[in-house]
Amino acid sequence: MSQQYTLPVTLPPALSQEPLKPVSPPADTQQEQVKQATPLPAPCQKMLSELPVEVPLEDAEKHTTLVKGVPEQECEPQPQEPQQQELHVEQQQQQQESQVQELHVDQQQQQQESQEQELHVDQQQQQQESQEQELHVDQQQQQESQVQELHVGHHQQQQESQEQELHVDHHQQQQESQEQELHVDQQQQQQESQEQELHVDQQQQQQESQEQELHVDHHQQQQESQVQELHVDHQQQQQESQEQELHVDQHQQQQESQEQELHVDQQQQELQVQEVQQQQQQQQEQQEDHQKAEHLEQEEAQREQQLKGQLEQEKKGVYQHLDQELTKRDEHLEKKGEHCWSSRRSL
């Protein structure tokens, strides 16, 4: 079950010997109360009343020394050393007491947290136990229902085996049902196998009964044939006619099968011929495509050659024209130069 955990706390010797006292306000508030309790001289009180409200008390005490006509000694409070020492001692005691109380509160909080954790753990354990109990109850119910189903199936199988007088199969089924109680998961498969075995046994019994009936009929026929020896020729003729009919039927079936095989062979040959024709057509199309591609390449090559020739001829014509213009310009410049030279000489 749950266990309580306590934390060790060490206190100073002075605090461990002194008893706990009620909580008192902090030291800052006590100092303010002491400061408010100490009366000031009349001039200082007047100046404090004239100061604004928002100025702190310490600043107000500083401002009291700056008043004209008032000596500094009058504004200073009377020294109270023994009272201050007592206040200091009380403040220390109160601080120590508050620390002790805080430690006590921390211990209580820790104890409460540990108790809450233990309660939470206990609740979880209880929930798990209840869930496990529910699962156990569900499993028991499932097992009981499965056992009941097994019992019903077993009872039905016993009735069927008693009706069919298959004692050996019934003994096997009892053994298998006992094994099925240990293997609940394999119950359906084993039941199906048992049903199949029963069905096979029934079929075997039916076959055996039919064979027995056939055997009896055959025996009766033999007896009748022995008694009816007069009708032997007729039976032989009937048998021969039946054999002939069978032979004719077989011959017809063979012919039909041969014709079907020939028809299948013809269809296969036609398919082969069609495939060969398709292959030939594909080859011809490929050859034609190849020839077309070669023809197009030749035409493109011829066009390129023609274009190259035309470009070369045009280049030659352009070059010739440029040469002619350059020669004309040179001749014109030479004529101009000669004319200028002659004019200069004349000058």
UniProtKB/Swiss-Prot annotation:
Pfam families: Involucrin2, Involucrin_N. Residues 164-173, 212-221, 287-341 have a biased composition (Basic and acidic residues). One of its GO terms (cellular component) is cytoplasm. It is found in: Cytoplasm. GO terms for biological process: keratinization. Residues 27-36 have a biased composition (Polar residues). It comes from the Eukaryota. InterPro entries: Involucrin-like, Involucrin2, Involucrin_CS, Involucrin_N. Keywords: Cytoplasm, Keratinization, Repeat. Signal peptide: none annotated. Residues 70-114, 138-161, 222-241, 265-285 have a biased composition (Low complexity). Keratinocytes of epidermis and other stratified squamous epithelia. The keyword Cytoplasm applies. Belongs to the involucrin family. This is Involucrin. The gene is IVL.
